[in-house]
A protein has these predicted regions:
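N-terminal Rossmann-fold cofactor-binding loop
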Residues: 30-35, 50-51
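SDR active-site strand-loop-helix element
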Residues: 6, 30, 68-71, 101-107, ...
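Glycine/proline-rich active-site loop of Rossmann-fold NAD(P)-dependent oxidoreductases
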Residues: 159-164, 190-198
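Substrate-positioning beta->alpha
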Residues: 81-82, 132, 150, 178-188
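N-terminal Rossmann NAD(P)H-binding glycine-rich loop of SDR-like oxidoreductase domains
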Residues: 3-23
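Conserved Rossmann-fold cofactor-binding substructure of NAD(P)-dependent oxidoreductases
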Residues: 45-65
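Conserved beta-loop-beta element that borders a ligand/cofactor-binding pocket
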Residues: 137-159
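NAD(P)-cofactor binding segment of oxidoreductase domains
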Residues: 74-101, 131-135
């Protein structure tokens, strides 16, 4: 497959990028600087640019079988990165005729905001980030693409377990966690299999 990945330099993105290349896929990524990722591979094309450069974003998605966004707000960084970037990604996909879109959201976004008292509390603590996820999900729903929104609970840097649960009717508890390595594996499998189109699966261990 030809994959376009946004957020490849992040904690989840690095796992996803390595897994994608190991699986034999051709990958194009958008980076703020050329040294944002240390991976070098003949099947990897790194494009340097910003999300407000629509022609650059379009060059990343051109010819892609699937576009994957694993963007997330960083401490001290822009708290609207997910929704701002998604606007550019959607315009680029429309311009290049690319339909498959997988975007990393969060359990507790959109209609899952009232899943439990704990989720409501989390939304209060990280209100700006969750509003960004809400806005991104609304954009994706209106995109006209073959979309999937992935909703993990709290993420960890633990090793991949390969034993995660996923589905649209799941309600993870307070202690639910997910290693970023497992999240990356789930996202790649979703891209490869074409599963969960038009759905927002929850995934956790």
């Amino acid at each position: 497959m030809r994959l376009a990945i946004f957020g490849a330099s992040g904690a989840t993105g690095r796992h996803l990028l390595q897994l994608s290349l190991d699986a034999g896929h051709t990958v194009t990524v958008l980076l703020r600087s050329a040294d944002s990722v240390s991976i070098r591979h003949p099947a990897l094309t790194a494009v340097v640019g910003q999300f407000d450069q629509l022609a650059t974003v379009a060059s990343v998605v051109q010819g892609a079988d699937a576009v994957i966004s694993v963007l997330g707000a960083r401490k001290g960084g822009a708290q609207t990165i997910c929704s701002d970037a998604m606007r550019s990604i959607m315009l680029a996909m429309q311009a290049k005729g690319v339909r498959r879109l997988i975007a990393l959201s969060a359990y507790g976004a959109a209609e899952s905001r009232d899943a439990s008292w704990f989720i409501r509390f989390v939304r209060m603590v990280i209100a700006d980030r969750m509003r960004d996820k809400d806005a991104m999900e609304a954009l994706v729903h209106s995109s006209g693409t073959d979309w999937t929104l992935v909703r993990p609970p709290a993420l960890t840097n633990g090793e991949a377990s390969g034993r995660y649960r996923s589905g649209t009717g799941l309600r993870p508890g307070i202690t639910a966690r997910l290693p970023r390595a497992d999240l990356a594996a789930f996202i790649l499998h979703t891209a490869e299999s074409g599963a969960f189109i038009g759905q927002a699966p929850v995934v956790f261990t």
